[in-house]
Amino acid sequence: MIIGNELKRPRRSDRAPRAVRRARPHGLPAIGMEAEFATIIDDVQVRPEDVFGSPRHIVRGPMVHRTGRSYHLPTGGAVYFDTGVIELATPMIEIARGCGARGTRSLWESLGFLREELDAWEQRHTRSVRLVGFSTHYNVSFDVPADESTNDRSVERLAFLLTHVLAAPVMLLAANRRSTGVGVRPRGDRIEVTADFTPDAALMAATATLIVGIVRDVMAWPSYDLAELARRGIPIVQGFSPVVHSSRQGWVARHACFPANPFTCDVNAPMWATSTGQRLSLRQMAGRTTREFWRSIRTLGDPLSLQLIAAVMRGRAPSLLELPNRPDAYDDVGRLCRWDDLFPLTLLPRSRFERVLGHAIAGRRVRMDGSWHRPIGVRGWSHVVFRRERDGVRRVMSLDEMLAHLDAWDRTADRRMSERRIAALARREIERRMLADRRARQEALDQQRRAMDQVGEVLDPSTTASDAPKVDAPSAAPPPVVRAWEDAPDSVVQHSSRHTH
């Protein structure tokens, strides 16, 4: 009896668990990070699209198209040109403990890869390229239920409220003396916090951890009214009012919104009259705000980032605002500041979304619903395009949907990696044996040449027979069959002789 492929029951390992099949349709809340860099070629700032045309002209290997003019890097991040800057973006990373550090690691891994490709471009074109840090964007999912958004809990009101809450702590962790503001943008299904690029991976991870902890906590407040700040004792500078963001909808805590420039003032001077009636320093305001949200920050933070946040807030570690000027590392990102494997995989494994996207970019096939599917592209941030190998039918799956097949995908990838390792070991063993055979043949030839040279000396007419040394001429090696016959045991020879007679 022949059963068609469409009637075959999927293997148990390929079927989604029952709990996953009943999961809510909105998907997991996630974060994502972006960084923008000005491009300096031969000490002149240029538009990258005018010089390179496309990221494909920088990266030497094949790239997976994401959307528009952006392409995925082998690291899982994306690169594209945006209004005169090079922008790097991380994949979606589900919100869980260590998500801020994972996002920072992904961003800096992509930055290191891009820097290596630019180094190769420099050698090919004999020109110099520098990346100057411009800004960093921290994106956090907004997932308030739709029936509650009508109760003044909209993403726009949340962004306005967060501009007041995040200003002081983000300034202390991420800004420098040449910064101009901290912004918050409502982006539909997410909140985007914008700040200057931080040329220190540890400080960036600490900033991401603080932002995601505060945003997720404020998102759960019953009201997004500014009166909540006074009720919870969160200090705000008197008279502070954010301005509208210049590029998109949103608000910015710009230096002109304060009585003095907070980016150039002494962070330890109690010079700010606050809504609580006290005069506090910038560090004190940031510390009190951080303590108010410490439970949420601690829940989502990794140990290293939590220690650094506490150290900066208490003054045990310096803020970039305390330096006399902006660090030189801003002017050559990827060289003067690098990723030094701050969060190794053994301590902080990849997130599930990272693993899904990594398999898709690598083109590793996965078995779903009884058929093999091969990824052929990516749509936007959250969808992968597959082609069913049996009939070529295309199928678009979200990252959340692919979580149900991630374990089977991992097993397939691990099995193929193991097979490749075994094949590599076999190839190396074959190469070793071939090299040993070549050396043995070469040594035999050298011995034969030396013997022939000695024979030539014996036959030299200038030497007499009495003076010539006695040298036995080498006998020709018997054929392999004869040599094998001679080396065979007597019992085998006698047995073979009886059969031949």
Show which residues each predicted segment covers:
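Histidine-centered divalent-metal-coordination microenvironment in nucleic-acid enzymes
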Residues: 128-144
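Short regulatory "switch" loops immediately downstream of catalytic or recognition motifs
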Residues: 43, 143-146
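Acidic, His- and aromatic-enriched active-site or binding-groove loops in soluble protein domains
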Residues: 151-172
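Inter-helical turn/loop segments and adjacent helix faces that build the functional surface
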Residues: 124-125, 145-151, 222-225
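Terminal catalytic/cofactor-binding subdomain
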Residues: 2-123, 132-134, 167-182, 186-191, ...
